[in-house]
Amino acid sequence: MKKKSKIAICGFNLESNRFAPTCAESDFRENMFFVDQEISDEARKDSPAIHLGVKGFYSEMNKLFGHDDNWIDVPTMVIGSCPAGPVEEAFFNEFLEQLRLKLLAAGPLDGVYICQHGAAVATHTHDPDGIMFDLVRRVVGDETPIVATLDLHANISELMTSAVDVLVGYRTNPHVDMFDRGVEAASVLREMLDGMQPKKYTIKLPLVAPSVTQLTAKGFPYGDLIRYGQEFLDEDIFNVTILSGFAFGDTPKNGMTIIVHSRSTVENAVVVAEKLAVSAWTDRTRYLPRMTSLEKAIGLAQQAQHSAEDAPFLFADPADNPGGGGRGNTTYILEAFIAAGIKNCVFSVFYDVAAVELACKSGVNSEIEITLNSQETNEYLSLIHI
């Protein structure tokens, strides 16, 4: 009887904004914190609360092996926070120790799937992702296949690439292919279990693309580059991952990273990676942000409120994006619009616990006076009474 493959599943998901408040254990527990059998149970639900990459991995593994009884899943820890600041050292070290003990207790493993974001920063290190990858490698040994999925905003270190055999990055922003990348990770891992020994080559460019230039729709440079990369897929080149990185991580490992995987030789991966690097660098001026000044925004808003023919406008402060670790509570646009007398506009989304509590107490359709940012202070905030 053929031996069943024993596969560990783990993951640490955090996109760290260097300029945001630190991230604690409570931030992970509020968002995604699954251990042991909870991981498998959640991944097999129709609408899971766990990362969709994990669901995709389980789904494809069951298909590839015929049934979930034909492979042995070893769920350990899959945790994740909403984008936030650097993770606290004590909690991260505790996570690493728990993960290490769970992997050791699992005994000899045939493979590991890591569902990771890849842009974490800790209060004590620029590279918690690399430290975790290296820990997994040291526990399972050099011969055990390890495949990781990554957010396309991942900031890649040499430790990350050396510790893991295959790095599979998202190809969409907004991210709608997390499930698919989990499926791909399972497919690659199955090939490795059957004897495929992947070779990869990595190029990091001195190019830190602003987040507003990283959409993957047609006409955006990053999307065009990703689609160009997929044209090289064939019987030998099985994965091309292009990670734009996350500027607000503010680490030495920032920069666009191109990773090409080959089934046969690293030389084949080098050829493709260099072509993509040349294309990205040639297009570097396309990544210059084209922002709207506050003055122009006021003018557009004034124009719109006096002309029914003008389409509605949406103005946002992208540097304060909660999806990128911002707090969602800067008031620059609000203050400018109030000073300019802009009317008939909706103000949203704003993070202020005290304001929410007061609004809830006052009830629907009530009018209230509030002071925004009354309970939080930092150099980017100001109090404003409305």
Label for each model-derived stretch:
Residues 8-15, 19, 29, 83, ...:
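Active-site histidine-anchored catalytic micro-motif
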Residues 58-64, 68-103:
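Low-complexity, highly charged intrinsically disordered N-terminal segments
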Residues 60, 194-300:
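Accessory alpha-helical/coil subdomains and C-terminal extensions
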Residues 370-382:
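Phosphate/diphosphate-binding loops
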